[in-house]
Amino acid sequence: MNIGLLLPSHARNHPNHTAVVCEDSRLSFREFNARVNRLANALSGLGVNKGDKVATILPNCLSLLETYWAVAKMGAVVVPLSSLLREKALSALIQDSDTGTIIASPDCAAPLANIRHELRNVPGERLILTGPSHAGFQNYDELEPIQ
C-alpha cells in the first residue's frame, strides 16, 4: 500500500476525527489533509517530483508531520537530518543524499547560509525555513500552492 493514500482515505472516512494534536493545535483529518495537500502542491510548484529527495531538519512539530505526509503523497523521499550536525557533516549528508529541497527550522538558518555555496543541487527557492522570514530562504508559511 502507498502510505500517501492513507491520509486522504482517513480524511474521506473520518473527516472530523482528530488527526493531530501538537502543542495547542488540534487538527481533524480533513484539516490536516488540506494542509498536507497545500504543501504538496507548493513543493510541486517549486519543481519537486516523484523520487526527489526532500531533507528535513526539524524538531517534532506540525511542519515536520505535514512535510512527511506531503512528500509521501508526491512519491518523493524524505531525508531526515539532525539539527545537531555540524556544517561539514550537514553539507556532506545533503550532497551525498542527492537532496534537492531542504525544509528546516529557523535555528538552521546560519549553518545553512554558511554552506549554501556547497549545495549545488538545492536551488534557492527550495531552501525553506519554518518560523520567521530570513533573507535568502523561502518561508514555509508563505509557500504558495500551484493553481
Regions found by a protein language model. Give the residues of each.
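Structural core segment of the AMP-binding/adenylate-forming
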Residues: L5, S25, G45-L46, K73-E144
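Conserved AMP-binding/adenylate-forming core of the ANL superfamily
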Residues: I3, P8, N16-C61, L65-W69, ...
